[in-house]
Amino acid sequence: MAKQTPLYDQHVACGARMVDFHGWMMPLHYGSQIDEHHLVRQDAGMFDVSHMTIVDLHGNRTREFLRYLLANDVAKLTQPGKALYTGMLNESGGVIDDLIVYFLSEDYFRLVVNSATRDKDLAWISQHAEPYQVEVTVRDDLALIAVQGPQAQQKVATLLTTEQQQAIAGMKPFFGIQTGDLFIATTGYTGEAGYEIALPKQQVVAFWQQLLAAGVKPAGLGARDTLRLEAGMNLYGQEMDEKTSPLAANMGWTVAWQPEDRQFIGRAALERQRMKGTEQLVGLIMTEKGVLRNELPVYFFDAAGNQHVGVITSGSFSPTLGFSIALARVPAGIGEHAVVQIRNREMPVRVTKPGFVRAGKAIVL
């Protein structure tokens, strides 16, 4: 039977259409996915993301452990509260998961990992933590709400104490701080400003209702997916998985090659891939009528006139732009134009960098 977050009854009360999402009953939408999407781009919306897993790591070798476990380098994290995005790789360079890691103190780091990969993530982390004597604590006592949009931070501030407001004042993106019972982070999955807020499960219903009263409306998984696609953000299981290199998933920027003597899991495989070359993740735009969908083939000719084929990993109509967009994994050598096979029609598409909307504005037109 699918699990429920502490906010399940709140979703039902808000009129949500509930669906099974990787073993969790989650809201797909509350009546209109399009309206929820626009709300986040133009004002503020909130998402229940309590199905995600928060993992706390304690021990005096935690930093050393994470420098081995993760492709990005936590040595970059010198200011308490600072966070970074990274892949956690297997020995063959495939992506076990993508996650955010927060540096809270020299013997205390926090990870936030995906719900679909929870069991294998925890097994992998625990297995590799043992030699470093790092204590792994799964924070199932916490719930998580993402409040996103240009008005999100302003509306959240109305619910905070003076001390909490002062604690987060001027906090830059990719930071997190514990203030009172709230862990407030300037992270998100929409391309908008906002917060992701972790708090004790027994307090989350009251906090959700306070957000509603402050004018923050709920948004479901449908809007979350179109928002992250417009922002060019990966979804685990589509843009990357255990057989996909981060170099082929627009995650090369998250791999810290320096210093050269840092050995991390998957490094040797990635170095071979870097020498040999990999596929790449690109953006696609189709302004003609129709919708780019996952798994449709993408055809193009390289400079030498050879035809290549790739595949759409995520595709949808873009509510912000008013036409169809996609992320696609393709062989190297693609130019500015390609063709997507939709049923029996070959539809022309424009090739872009993977990212279409930032802070509510188009960045591809």
Curated annotation (Swiss-Prot):
What's a Gene Ontology MF term here? transaminase activity
Q: Which reaction does it catalyse?
A: N(6)-[(R)-S(8)-aminomethyldihydrolipoyl]-L-lysyl-[protein] + (6S)-5,6,7,8-tetrahydrofolate = N(6)-[(R)-dihydrolipoyl]-L-lysyl-[protein] + (6R)-5,10-methylene-5,6,7,8-tetrahydrofolate + NH4(+)
What GO biological process term is on the record, naming one?
glycine decarboxylation via glycine cleavage system
Q: Which Pfam families match?
A: GCV_T, GCV_T_C
User: What Enzyme Commission number(s) apply to this enzyme?
Assistant: 2.1.2.10
Q: Which GO terms describe its cellular component?
A: cytosol; glycine cleavage complex
Keywords of this entry:
Aminotransferase, Transferase
Give the first-level EC class, as a single word: transferase
Q: Which family does it belong to?
A: Belongs to the GcvT family.
Q: What does this protein do?
A: The glycine cleavage system catalyzes the degradation of glycine.
Name of this protein: Aminomethyltransferase
> From which source organism is this entry?
Yersinia pseudotuberculosis serotype O:1b (strain IP 31758)
